[in-house]
Amino acid sequence: MPIQKCKPTSPGRRFVEKVVHSHLHKGKPFAALVEAKKRTGGRNNNGHITTRHVGGGHKQHYRLVDFKRNKDGIPAVVERIEYDPNRTAHIALLKYADGERRYIIAPKGLRAGDKVQSGNDAPIRPGNCLPLRNMPIGSTLHNVELKIGKGAQLARSAGTSVQLLGRDGSYAIVRLRSGEMRKIHVECRAVIGEVSNQENNLRSLGKAGASRWRGVRPTVRGMAMNPVDHPHGGGEGRNKGIQPVSPWGQKAKGYKTRTNKRTTKMIIRDRRVK
C-alpha cells in the first residue's frame, strides 16, 4: 500500500506519514462480535501504577477475534477486511457455511470474497489453519499455538511470521522473526501466510498527540530525574554513575529475566545469539 505524506499545513502535520488502505471496510464493526473495553490507566485494583506510560486515549471497542480456528471442515467466505484499533494487524470478518460469523487476524493478501478453511485436510493457501504436522517444510506461518487447543500466541502482530524448518518426532522446529529457534508440538495449529499490514512500521505519527490518542504517555529518561525518583537521577551534569538499571534497580542490559524454566528446553537457539 502507498505511503502518504501530509502537506505541512501545521507543525503537527509536517512529519505525518500514513499508510493508505483503500480495501478496508469503512463502516462500523459487526455488533455481535464487539465488547466494551474499560481503560485501567496502567493501575491495578489498589490504584497503584503497575504499567508505566499508559493512560488516556480514545475510547475503543474490543473485537472478539477467533485465535483457535476450531470450526473444522466448514468453509468460510471473507465478507470484509476491517481496521482494529486494538492491534497493529487488520482483521477479517468470516461468514461460515452454517451462518456463523467470526473475526480472524487477516493474513497478507486476503481480500473480500476469498474462501478460508480450518482442519487437517485444509488446502495449503493463505488464511487456512491446520496442524503443524500437515504443513510443508519451509512454509511461512502466523498465529501459531504453543499449547494444543489453547489458541494462537506467536506471530500475531502486523507483518510478522515464523518459518517451519523441519520436524523431529512429535515436535516441529520453527524460526521466529527474532532469530529464536524453538520446538512446538506438531498437533499445535498455525495459519498459512504472514500477517497483514506489513507497512505498519513505515508510518510516522508526526506529533506527540497521536501517541496520546493511542493511550501512550510520555517516557522520561532516568538521567533527567532527581535521585529520589530513579537510580540514574541527580549528579553534576550528565552522569549516570552506575551501569544502566530500571527505576527499581534491576540491570537493564544483558540481564536475563526469563523465569519459565519448564519450557526452556524447547528453545534450540536463543534470540540473543547473533
Swiss-Prot record:
Renumbered to this chain, the Basic and acidic residues biased-composition regions fall at 229-239
On whether RNA-binding is a keyword of this UniProt record, the answer is yes
Signal sequence extent: none
**A Gene Ontology term for the protein's cellular component:** large ribosomal subunit
GO MF annotations, alphabetized: rRNA binding; structural constituent of ribosome; transferase activity
- What domain of life does the native source organism fall in? Bacteria
User: Entry's Pfam families?
Assistant: Ribosomal_L2 (PF00181), Ribosomal_L2_C (PF03947)
Q: Which UniProt keywords apply?
A: Ribonucleoprotein, Ribosomal protein, RNA-binding, rRNA-binding
Q: Does the keyword rRNA-binding apply?
A: yes
For region Disordered, the annotated ranges are 222-256
Q: An example of a Gene Ontology BP annotation on this entry?
A: cytoplasmic translation
UniProt similarity note: Belongs to the universal ribosomal protein uL2 family.
Assembly mode: Part of the 50S ribosomal subunit. Forms a bridge to the 30S subunit in the 70S ribosome.
HAMAP family named in the record = Ribosomal_uL2_B
Q: Per its database record, what is this protein's job? A: One of the primary rRNA binding proteins. Required for association of the 30S and 50S subunits to form the 70S ribosome, for tRNA binding and peptide bond formation. It has been suggested to have peptidyltransferase activity; this is somewhat controversial. Makes several contacts with the 16S rRNA in the 70S ribosome.
Supply the name of the protein: Large ribosomal subunit protein uL2
The protein's organism comes out as: Acinetobacter baylyi (strain ATCC 33305 / BD413 / ADP1)
- Gene assigned in the entry: rplB
